[in-house]
Amino acid sequence: MDTLKKLKFEANGIIGVLLDYSREPVLTNIIDQFRTSLESNDIELIRYSLEQLKTWYARNRNEIYKNEFVFNEFEHHETENKIKKFLDELPVVDETEKSSITHFSSDQNRELEKKIFISHSSKDKIVCNAFVELLEDIGVSSEDIIYTSSPYHGIPGDEDIFEYLKKHLFKGAYVFYMLSDNYYDSVYCLNEMGATWVNSNNCSTFILPGFKGEIKGVIDKNKKAFSLEEPIDLFNLKEKILRMYDLTLEDKKWERIKAKFNTKLK
């Protein structure tokens, strides 16, 4: 039996052990992607999904083994080893094969790398509207911003947001997580966080005014977040955007843009 057939045979067992332990949004999104990759025989995506499962185990292994309600530690040990073994045995897709199977041309990839997805709670629309306007004032085109609280930046009608992100933003789109108490109180936002984290390697975190909680979920706590109320963070954001889009901005104009944004935050 070849490796792919064996993986398909073992997949339900692997998924069952994982879902028996947790149905958190991050894990369920990885598993959905894993299932899709197996159905399409996409080796590159299968390897990517297995890498994500391997990373999930690395982050959660200690918690699993310390949990007094987990009675199948051996099954988790075996499942993690299976994931590693399949990664070792599955062929690596070389660059020639990648170029022939990818759904995106190089021009489309470069275009997608410019996209910014604003992951936010609709209850924070006023602050996030001001933030999107800030990005546009710095020089980001409205076409490069995906922001569902605005009809000018939203996802096309009849499109499922998660499927749209998987289908169109898989190749390098940047995600801006706009964290607030409203964000963490929303199951929808947490699901969105999981889906975008799985499908994007590029992200930045922003702390909205009044946020009283702590950074949780899949976001790296050790990666410094931008505070919208800190002048130095706004400056660093501006510099980041200018580098991303190869833009220039006069200091005097930036001061006017920053002042307008700060006024809208109050």
Swiss-Prot record:
Pfam families found in the cross-reference section: TIR_2
Protein name per the record: Uncharacterized protein YddK
UniProt domain TIR: residue ranges: 112-261
Matches recorded under PROSITE patterns: TIR
GO biological process: signal transduction
Origin species: Bacillus subtilis (strain 168)
Catalytic activity annotation: NAD(+) + H2O = ADP-D-ribose + nicotinamide + H(+)
E.C. number: 3.2.2.6
